[in-house]
Structures are given as C-alpha cells and as structure tokens.
C-alpha cells in the first residue's frame, strides 16, 4: 500500500483470497500443472492485521492485468481501478486469454473504472507522464510491451530515496543496467510485444 495525504492506493494487488477458484475455474489441467504459485498473506488480510478496513484503499493501479497482479481486485469491490485505454481495449478482447489473463478477476460489475490519461510532459526518459497527486511524489509512466498498456510508477520520498516500480517489464534490475530482455522462453510466453519491451528497457 502506498500512503499519501491525499489518498491511499495499491500498485498491483498480488494474489487474492479467491485465487484457488480463479485458477481452477479458468485454467485447463495442463495449464494448472504449469502455473505455480504460493499463497502468502493477502493484501486484504494485511490491512485487517494492521487495523485497517478495505475501504481504507481509495484506488488501485495495476501495473498490468496478468493474473498474478490483479487477483485481489475482487477483494475490493466498488473501488476505483485505474487502466490505460490500450490495456482496457485488450484485456476484454478475445485475444486476452488464460493463463496470462483471467477475466473473472477483473470483469466485476462493481468495479469503478478510471481511465489513465498521460500528459505530454516528459519524465526521465519517458515522453509522457501523470503526476498522480500533482506534487511530484508519485509519477506514472507508460511502459508498454509486457502487456498492451503496462504502467510503471516512480515513488519519490521526502528522504530523497526514489523507487521505480516496473511491474514485469523485467524480472531483474540488471536487465535495466545492461540492458537485456527476459530469457527467450518466458519472453515468448508472457510478453505481448517484445519490440516495445526492448524500447522500454
């Protein structure tokens, strides 16, 4: 959870309380044998254990809509969920298929969708950006490639520390430093557009 005086939000949700059903309802026997996950504490339970209610979350920004990043959306009904237009168009299309996309996780009628509209304001190496609270502390940028409309988040702390949350653009910080993409096998399985990924990195 990211806490800010103007609102609290999740950047991705991880696995939710209904992950077992989501997997069994939507993946074939073969896919279930390949897709592995380990259930740890859900974000909903983390909130409860820290004395917070689910409505403590003002909105959710998934970096992208793969199953392991949005499973817990169903644990927060009636919450504002942010999405880019390109991601929105893709995840509800016939091209978005399991195991990468599980529509049951994000097609709830109770979800309150909010479209992410980037401004033509450069930030670092990105030509567009969105200052979430208009104070320079939390900046969204487009990082398309892993999915059609993936987003990354810069968090600039008062201490001077900076963090860049990139979703699954890469799985290793060294990939940004080299730069390099994922191994060819997982890249073909999970990345939507390898050319865009290469440009992003």
Where are these regions (language model features)?
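Conserved beta-strand hairpin/beta-sheet module of binuclear metal-dependent hydrolase folds
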Residues: 1-44, 153-169
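Active-site neighborhood of phospho(di)ester-bond hydrolases with catalytic His/Asp-centered motifs
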Residues: 10-14, 59-64, 83-84, 142-145, ...
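Solvent-exposed loop/turn segments at secondary-structure junctions
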Residues: 15-17, 65-68, 88-89
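Short, solvent-exposed loop/turn and secondary-structure capping segments
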Residues: 21-22, 72-75, 93-94, 176
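Active-site metal-binding motif and surrounding structural segment of the metallo-beta-lactamase
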Residues: 25-83
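Metallo-beta-lactamase
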Residues: 35-52, 56, 85-144, 148-201
